[in-house]
Amino acid sequence: MDNSGKQAEAMALLAEAERKVKNSQSFFSGLFGGSSKIEEACEIYARAANMFKMAKNWSAAGNAFCQAAQLHLQLQSKHDAATCFVDAGNAFKKADPQEAINCLMRAIEIYTDMGRFTIAAKHHISIAEIYETELVDVEKAIAHYEQSADYYKGEESNSSANKCLLKVAGYAAQLEQYQKAIDIYEQVGTSAMDSPLLKYSAKDYFFKAALCHFCIDMLNAKLAVQKYEELFPAFSDSRECKLMKKLLEAHEEQNVDSYTEAVKEYDSISRLDQWLTTMLLRIKKTIQGDEEDLR
């Protein structure tokens, strides 16, 4: 069946679901089990939504899932309603990101009301990702990652909470909210130190915290590096710590060439990502007579 055939079938199912809802409101249905007609309508709306999905009519699919969700709420089937709102959100993601967020927020309300905080956290991440990629609103993405981290922490899912917090730290630093980023990197770095599995990544978090300190003030960065070396001796031997010391020295001497050379040398072994490049360029700009490029 081609898309137009699926679309037509979906429209027919919608009409059937609407008839069921109308019939459930009649006087006789009220006496003889109107709720079973509503249940049938829920099912038919969901079938229509899936048919719209097959026809790639994402908005219509989202609307049909929303209709099913509203009816589930009428029947006090909270879990089913939340599931339909999530399905609606996923359909709207492809057509109307703001509407996707609205549907996911409805689902989150239901899940938090039911005490299902882990699943609510997961949907806050989905909303944060829509703000990151579709709507490009970093402040709102941060807010949803923070909310997600709070819920995960409350449920003792610390590694999931830390993943969200690291997203917050990355964006906070980009927005020049350095102290906020430092607090998170230090907190996550300290907890990683105590885990045999995560120990290796602690140096990266202390490195990022040190770079944020450097963006505020060179002396801050110097003291931070000393603190991290005492706290986590393995940091001293890391390439990240050695790079920090070279950068501090270059900055102290106001030597752009040795700063660039140190970055180049590091980049030849560990490729710089976009975040590190941004931070290193910001620091480089505080050296007199800098040029725009890092390498």
From Swiss-Prot:
InterPro entries in UniProt: NSF_attach (IPR000744), TPR-like_helical_dom_sf (IPR011990)
SUPFAM superfamilies (alphabetical): TPR-like
N-acetylmethionine modification, residue list: M1
Subcellular localization: Cell membrane
Keywords: Acetylation, Cell membrane, ER-Golgi transport, Membrane, Phosphoprotein, Protein transport, Transport
GO biological process entries: apical protein localization; brain development; intracellular protein transport; neuron differentiation; regulation of synaptic vesicle priming; SNARE complex disassembly; synaptic transmission, glutamatergic; synaptic vesicle priming
Membrane topology (UniProt): Peripheral membrane protein
Pfam families the record matches: SNAP
Record-given protein name: Alpha-soluble NSF attachment protein
GO cellular component: glutamatergic synapse; myelin sheath; neuromuscular junction; postsynapse; presynaptic active zone membrane; synaptobrevin 2-SNAP-25-syntaxin-1a complex
Keyword Cytoplasm: no
Chain's role: Required for vesicular transport between the endoplasmic reticulum and the Golgi apparatus. Together with GNA12 promotes CDH5 localization to plasma membrane.
Subunit structure: Interacts with PRKCABP, and disrupts the interaction between GRIA2 and PRKCABP, leading to the internalization of GRIA2. Found in a complex with VAMP8. Component of a SNARE-like complex that contains at least ZW10, USE1L, RINT1, STX18 and NAPA/SNAP-alpha. Interacts with VTI1A. Interacts with STX12. Interacts with GNA12 (via N-terminus); the interaction promotes CDH5 localization to plasma membrane.
Family: Belongs to the SNAP family.
GO MF, any single term: protein-containing complex binding
Modified residues (Phosphoserine): S26, S29, S195
Primary localization class, coarse: membrane
